[in-house]
Amino acid sequence: MSTQDLEASMRKSVEATQRNFNTIRTGRANSSLLDRISVEYYGAETPLKSLATLSTPDSQTIQIQPFDISALASIEKAIAMSELGFTPNNDGKIIRINVPPLTEERRKEFCKLASKYAEEGKVALRNLRRDAIDKIKKQEKEGEFSEDQSRDEQDGVQKTLDKFIAELEKHLASKEADILKV
């Protein structure tokens, strides 16, 4: 595995963790909160994003305008059944969700969830490091690398890991600051 391949894989892990962070509520309304909601539409589970336009007209409201009005009831039901705890308001054409301010207890829960996502991201990064080091050791056994080259390559892999873990920690700190901001 080349350094570029390793960095690309690690970048994808960090981006996946960032997408997970985006699904966590902060004090403001954000349409990405609804990214994981699937709607029963003509017998198939369909992502909400492909059934409606999502917007945030103000900091406390998410607005959902379905492309097909017949999907309105299904969308409303899916949002009400989700673990987000939102109560959708349906006016016959548009669904509005008022995002209430977070309580201190909920903020702490969301910080714990963000930490959990960050830890999962770190585990994924460490697994990539382990795979890369195993390949290097295998190449050393096969005679492609000398012992010194192998050690240098392993040090490079570790430095790459450290860089991406620091980036992940920075994203986590930023998300926690967003969550805790009143």
Curated annotation (Swiss-Prot):
Keywords: Cytoplasm, Protein biosynthesis. CDD domains: RRF. It comes from the Bacteria. GO terms for biological process: translational termination. It is found in: Cytoplasm. One of its GO terms (cellular component) is cytoplasm. Responsible for the release of ribosomes from messenger RNA at the termination of protein biosynthesis. May increase the efficiency of translation by recycling ribosomes from one round of translation to another. NCBIfam families: frr. Belongs to the RRF family. This is Ribosome-recycling factor.
